[in-house]
Amino acid sequence: MIVHLIDGTYELFRHFYGLRRGNPDEDPPDGAVKGVLQTVGHMVRTGATHIGVATDHVIESFRNDLYPGYKTGEGIEPALWAQFHPLEKALAEMGFVVWPMVELEADDALASAAHLAAADPRVEKVCIWTPDKDLSQCVVGDRVVQVDRKSGKIRNADGVREKFGVGPELIPDYLALVGDSSDGYPGVPKIGAKTAARLLNKHGPIESFPDDVLGEHRADALLFKKLATLRTDAPLFKNVDELKWTEPK
């Protein structure tokens, strides 16, 4: 059994702006929704059987209480935002399992679902369909992998190390050091990708760094790590069989 976990928020953005590139003068009111439905439907037609889709029902989450600069819904175009809830409804009507997240984020749902699915010995592989670097922390060997639909790459644990210079278990630390502009936190000044990887490979997680490595920025780095660490405890399902797609009657 292969479990497919889809970042519905990313897919909606992808199709919305993909349509705009083709027709910049018009935003079809349900164009992105139709695009996502076609994408997920194609997965079923090509053999996918167990599918879950995570969406951000609201953009804000518990992380906004931890850090005031964390991403919000500000700046999301009304024409795009208007398609979030219709997408959730349409996917459910098509027979797909949908997780519309409120207190947690869609990324937390994907991480939790991957954790739950991987615990079932019947599951051969878990594919997380998103290019979001946050989700690289969920990769486990060749069994839980990240699929970047944009590039077509399937990233296993070795692929994560090749891309970031550290293993999946250190991705939250890596992001804490280099920052993540899409999520709204800056990282530690003067630490780029290569320096972050070097420090993490030398010392291990941020908690193990000697005090003088980060100095006055240590507390911020630990906070950013908390922001970057995905939750894996969302009670999304009890049995992976619940993810099996069934054609609506």
Report the location of each language-model feature.
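Conserved SAM-binding loop
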Residues: 128
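Non-catalytic nucleic-acid-binding/docking modules located in mid-to-C-terminal regions
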Residues: 47-52, 122, 151-249
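Noncatalytic, basic helical substrate-engagement surface that gates or grips nucleic-acid strands
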Residues: 1-125, 135-154, 222-223, 229-237, ...
